[in-house]
Structure formats: C-alpha cells, structure tokens
Amino acid sequence: MHHHEQVALIQRALALIENQASERGEPAVSPLQRYTDPVRYMREITHIFRQHPLALCPSASLAQPGDVLAVDVAGVPLLLVRGEGGTLHGFINACRHRGTRLLAAGLHRARSFVCPYHSWTYGLDGALRGRPHGDDFPHAPAKDCGLTAVPAAEALGFVWAIPRAVTPGENARLDINAYLGRFGSDLRHWGYDTWVPFQQREFANAANWKLPFEGNLETYHFQYAHRNTIARLFYDNLLMADHDGAHHRIVLPKRSIEGLRALAPSQWQVGAHANIIYFFFPATFILHEGDHANVFTVLPEAVDRSRVFGATLIPAMPVTEKAINYWRKNAESFWGALDEDFALGVSAQSTMASGANQVLYFGATEWCAAKFHADVERLIGG
C-alpha cells in the first residue's frame, strides 16, 4: 500500500474517531437455508468454489522442486507441485488408469508420482512416464494420459488454484493479478512473496463455510467475544471498508492511532496502528499486522462442515530464542482470538435446526458481512 493511501486511511480513521462514528451500510437478514440447505450448498460449490481462485498454501511451503501438497478442495483432490526448474503445477490427485489417489493428504517430497494400484508413474510435470504392460492400452495413448491439470499459479507469496479440470484451450496458468484487482497492489507492497510461514495450522470446523467470515467482517462483537483477548486494543464497533467487486479491504484502527495526531503525516504508517484485513472472495482471509501477516482459507466439506488451513507469515525464519518467542506470541494472539470466533460459529451452526430462528440479522455496522452474502447470492442465482 503506497504511503499516500496509508495517510488517507489514517485521516479517515481519525475523523471517525473524532466524531464517534463508524461506517455503516444497509441492515440485512440472512435466511437459515444459507447454512443448512444441501441443494443450495452444491450450487455454492459449482458456481463459486469451482470458479474462483483459492490461496491454498504459502509459496514457501513448496520451496524446492519435488515439494508437493495434496489437499481436498470442495470435493476435488488436488496435487500442487513444485516442478523441475521451479515451475508450479496443479493437478487432480487421481490416476488416469482407474482413478486411485496418488498421494494421501499433506505435504510430501517426491521425484515422481506412482499409483499404488497398478504402478502407473507420472513426472512432476504430470506426464505419464511409464506403466506396466503398456501394450495393453492401445486405446489410451500415453500422451493422452497425463494427470489432469487444474488452473493454478504462484503469486504474491501464495499458491493459488481453482478445483476443476482445465477446459479445452484454457491456459492452466491463472491470471492472479486480474483476480486480486486493486488490492493486489497492496500485497505487492507488503512483500509477501519473500515471507515464510512461521506456524501453520489445519483443523476441522463444525460449521458452514460462510460462518467464519461473518465474524471476521465486522467488529460489533469485539467488546464481548474478545473482551479477554484483543478487545482492549481496538475501538468499539469501528471499521472502515473498501471493496473491489466481491473483495474486501477492512481497516480496524487501534487505540494507538490517535498518537499519530502529534506526528507529521510523512511519519505515519498504517500497519503500526491498525489491522488491515484482505478478504479475497470466496474464502481467502489475510490479516496484515505491519511486521507480519496471518492468513487462512476456509474450505467447505459439507453444508454444515468445513476445514481451515492457516499460517502466520513473517519476513524471515527466526534464529534466536528471543525472536522465536516474539513470533510465537504474535501467532498465539491471533489464533487465540480466531478460536473464539470459530467456536461461536460452531455454536450458531448447532442451533440451526432447533426452530428458534428462520432468519439471522445483520445490523448497519455489520454491512460487510451482509455484502459477502449478497455476493454469494448473486453468483449462485439466489
């Protein structure tokens, strides 16, 4: 984010604080079918998750040729592969012979992929390199039996992919800059492409995939849900939001920001006095905190179940005990607050079938959560 834009955001925040105001939008309702209807859920998978890029891991997780991540994304098993020469590839994790998965979920080191069923063998570029009794398959030429590619790319410190097969004539290399829009320039400015993951987490979440984002697109809950963790750092129910299509950039001013009134604008740095949230639709969340960032992606597994992949990104791996403890404390602070949010989402999901509610409500300062749902509705034809 260029300095002139940082200054404009700080001026905007100071004006809201001075006027004891917050940015507001239209109140909205959210029908419970959004969280419980399996037919609607499949429309979300088809029209959203299989059409939009997702950040699936930091680039540094696949640092060397032969580094592989196997991960299930919206019902599609993927292989994200650092190939020879450093090229990033994405494939469906399924043998072209009889469909068996080549690798179990997780991070791997590999020189090739060997199917455990009949030993069909693929290179890191996805090409079929060998198969026993190859003469038995005149109807399946080796050149036509490479792994099925998916759109994928590496950009701005993350590995991105869309969980669907590349269509005929489609370039398998994603244009991530076009997808990120104007907020992509912020990520370039922060320099995430050289940062490394200090800690990574993966966990099951017994809630619809949308619930975690609702809680992270508003601050109305901070003084109550986070009263023992981060609430003291922030103003009550105050955020600033900008949008580019379905993407959000949300700024959460910290109480320390008022100290900037005593400094010349040339000395202002927004990252030191505010948290900056980037939500890249549909499911990638980046929290920039000045000297580090926290990122997570929520992947749906069923209408009432999802899985979270997250990491704390830092400029370089620490080598001293003091530095290790510093980054550990920052990561624990983030995940401690986030665990509070996720627990509340799980609690809400557990009441959906009780008959207590037919709709849920978003107030005027929860308008970013309402916009998120409006974008989902637009894309699935709701």
Model-derived regions, located:
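Short, solvent-exposed coil/turn linker segments
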Residues: 31-33, 57-58, 140-141, 175, ...
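Short, flexible segments with low predicted structural confidence
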Residues: 12-20, 124, 182-185, 269-270
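N-terminal pre-ligand scaffold of iron-sulfur
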Residues: 1-94, 98-105, 151-153
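N-terminal short leaders/motifs
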Residues: 10-38, 100-114, 148, 228-262
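Rieske [2Fe-2S] iron-sulfur-binding domain
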Residues: 61-178
